[in-house]
Design a protein with these regions (language model features):
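ABC ATPase "signature
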Residues: 196-197, 205
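A short, proline-enriched helix->beta-strand linker immediately N-terminal to the Walker B motif
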Residues: 130-134
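Conserved ABC ATPase signature
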Residues: 111-115, 119-121
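Helix-to-loop junction immediately C-terminal to a conserved catalytic motif
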Residues: 26
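Conserved ABC ATPase "signature" region
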Residues: 41-42, 78, 82, 89-106
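ABC ATPase NBD coupling module
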Residues: 43-59, 83, 88, 202-206
Length: 316
């Protein structure tokens, strides 16, 4: 269930069914079973006229823009209104408003061939918004863009969501898009949702192996650090999954682990205002497990030790 006004992300491996699921929302694909409801309305048995209205209310943008090369920016944006029979004066007024919203007023008479990738996607967004939809579907909308244009398009989508109260549903292979933009995320595998929740929860403590594989760098394991330990050394991993809201405090960590602690590596970032990641620390002398576990909550959300396989698997 996707709430009105939220930004909802869908991730999964290639072939998981992400694009098919997205296209079910506006009935570009037909469901073999089950039901999809939009604002409480079942859409499975819609007539042609009802489908036209549905696709006006549920707009879509694509990875490859799909602009008409022989029409200007303004003409591309105007096209859905023209096809719907909207009067010319009303069309022009609406196009002017939308071009101003997406920052393309100065390029209204430009041809698609003269636009950058980011400008083309902004045109696609404007064309989708011109019918005043309630929901915007984004099918890999930033995959063809460079990092700078990706950031600009994500910022625009966030502004549109906040200003218009628009519900946005997106699919992507880019975890940074989910981190930056989404309120909640679902993980799809073989056409089934295997995990979903707030972004910080799913990224901070993924419960499924597929999710951990997709997140990759946030939940890696480096066996070579274990192999490099001498007989008397100990490896401590501090996990931050966002559940307590605390941040790494080096002073507290040093107080708990002692002066003979060395930071091997760490990876932490903020997602929805919560710190997600881990720190791995080598101790010159091992500390008693009960002592560390008793005080673990003082410095991290979880703590695991080298060789503590059961604890590490439970926390993975």
């Amino acid at each position: 269930q996707i709430a009105q006004g939220e930004i909802f992300g869908i991730i999964g491996r290639s072939g998981a069914g992400k694009s098919t699921l997205l296209r079910l929302f506006n009935r570009l694909e037909n469901a073999d079973s089950g039901e999809i409801t939009i604002h409480g309305e079942h859409t499975r048995h819609y007539s042609r006229s009802q489908l036209r209205d549905l696709r006006r209310r549920v707009a879509m943008i694509f990875q490859h823009f799909n602009l008409m090369a022989t029409k200007t920016v303004a003409q591309n944006v105007e096209l859905p209104l023209k096809m719907a029979g909207v009067p010319r004066a009303e069309r022009q007024k609406r196009v002017d408003e939308i071009l101003a919203l997406v920052g393309l007023s100065a390029l209204r008479d430009s041809w698609p061939a003269k636009l950058s990738g980011g400008q083309k996607q902004r045109t696609g967004i404007a064309r989708a918004l011109v019918t005043q939809p309630e929901i915007l579907l984004c099918d890999e909308a930033t995959s063809a863009l460079d990092p700078e244009n990706t950031h600009a398009v994500l910022k625009l989508l966030k502004e549109i969501n906040q200003r218009l109260g628009l519900t946005i549903v997106l699919i992507t292979h880019e975890m940074d898009v989910i981190r930056t933009l989404c309120d909640r995320v679902a993980v799809l595998e073989h056409g089934e949702i295997i995990e979903q929740g707030e972004v910080w929860r799913v990224f901070g403590h993924p419960g499924h192996a597929v999710t951990r594989s997709l997140l990759g760098t946030l939940h890696h394991d480096r066996a070579e650090e274990r192999l490099s330990l001498s007989e008397n050394q100990q490896l401590v991993t501090l996990h931050f999954d966002g559940s307590s809201g605390q941040e790494p405090d080096l002073q507290r960590i040093a107080a708990l682990l002692g002066a003979d602690a060395r930071l091997l590596y760490g990876s932490c970032e903020q997602i929805q205002g919560r710190v997600i990641g881990q720190l791995r620390i080598r101790l010159a002398k091992p500390l008693a497990n009960p002592h560390l576990q008793q005080h673990a909550g003082w410095v991290a959300d979880r703590l695991t030790l080298s060789g503590d396989t059961a604890a590490e698997n439970a926390g993975a």
